[in-house]
From Swiss-Prot:
Disulfide bonds join C29-C58, C36-C51, C41-C59. This is Beta-defensin 39. Has antibacterial activity. Coiled coil: none annotated. It comes from Rattus norvegicus. GO terms for cellular component: extracellular space. Pfam families: Defensin_beta. The lineage of its organism: Eukaryota, Metazoa, Chordata, Craniata, Vertebrata. GO terms for biological process: defense response to Gram-negative bacterium; defense response to Gram-positive bacterium; innate immune response in mucosa. Belongs to the beta-defensin family.
C-alpha cells in the first residue's frame, strides 16, 4: 500500500508541473539570455516571444536611450 501511494505521488508531481521548461520556446528564450514570466513582462522589459509552450512571455531588457548633454567648451 505504501509503495502504490508513493508511486501515485511521484506520477502526480511529474504530470502536474506548473512551470515546466521542457518547451522548445522556453529553451530558445533562455539561450538568448532573456527571462520568462508567466503573467506579463515588467515595465523595464519588452515582450519578444513566448515561454512555457505559449503560456508565458519571453521578456528582454529594454534599451534605454538617455541623452547626456554635451559640455560647452
Amino acid at each position: 500500500m505504501k509503495i502504490s501511494c508513493f508511486l501515485l505521488l511521484v506520477l502526480s508531481l511529474s504530470c502536474f508541473q506548473i512551470n515546466s521548461v521542457s518547451g522548445i520556446d522556453s529553451v530558445k528564450c533562455f539561450q538568448k539570455n532573456n527571462t520568462c514570466h508567466t503573467i506579463r513582462c515588467p515595465y523595464f522589459q519588452d515582450e519578444v516571444g513566448t515561454c512555457y509552450e505559449g503560456r508565458g512571455k519571453c521578456c528582454q531588457k529594454r534599451l534605454l536611450s538617455i541623452r547626456v548633454p554635451k559640455k560647452k567648451v
